[in-house]
Amino acid sequence: LSDLIRISWSHKESPDTYTVLPGEECVIGVQTKGRISLGSGKQSKTLSKAGITGILRGPRTFISEKNTKSLLVYISPLLLSRMIPVPMDQISDSSLSLEDLFSKEAISGLIADCEEADWKGQEASLTLEKFRRLLPLKEEKEKFLPQAILRIKGSLGEIGIKGLASDLGVSQSSLERGFRSRVGLSPKEYAGLVRFGNIFRFYNSSSSLTELALEAGYYDQAHFIREFKKKTGFSPKQWFRQNANLGLDSNF
């Protein structure tokens, strides 16, 4: 499971407003100090101390208080779907309290465990067992879905969904249904997310945005700009100019 889950501590000493871009993972976060809000200005809403953000189609703005420390678990939606009691399309583009999915007692225990791990200075990886106790793994019944994900990634998001379903020996409607309930997106949307990730992977080796668009799997510059704007709120030129000094990471 280690290749499907990443876990780390995040410590923001100063108040911070930051944007999270769509990525291929969902995020479970537990604040051991401080709080995080979703949105900015009058529209902001304080999130619960233990929450989950599903797979995103567009950018999300978060605000962290001074001295906020969080344990963050990045997890593939396919794996998460075997741990939670609701279809993944119910948590797409949403940030929910873990109490919406599990008992109050279980979440209180999890928060206490994470606070103890913080106090003891434990490595993030040592706390993973606490999440595994809360989230027992159900059996994988739709074996074609992990295969579909691998093929979409292997093609860099340039794959026909009808042909993919045929190669996997399932109907296109079964593939679509499986993706919505287990990933939270349609196969086409997921392929778009893979292409979006390619932009950051190939950015440093591309000599121009035109070359980058083709390398990342977009069929022309207009397609690239349109899709990039949907996922960031900016044109590629604007975004890379503003983020020239930042590490290119599409997650927290």
Which residues does each predicted region cover?
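A secondary-structure capping/hinge motif
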Residues: 179-185, 228-238
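Long, low-complexity intrinsically disordered regions
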Residues: 159-162, 176-181, 188-191
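Alpha-helical bundle regulatory/interaction domains
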Residues: 1-146, 153-154, 160-162, 168-172, ...
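Conserved structured core elements
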Residues: 190-193, 222
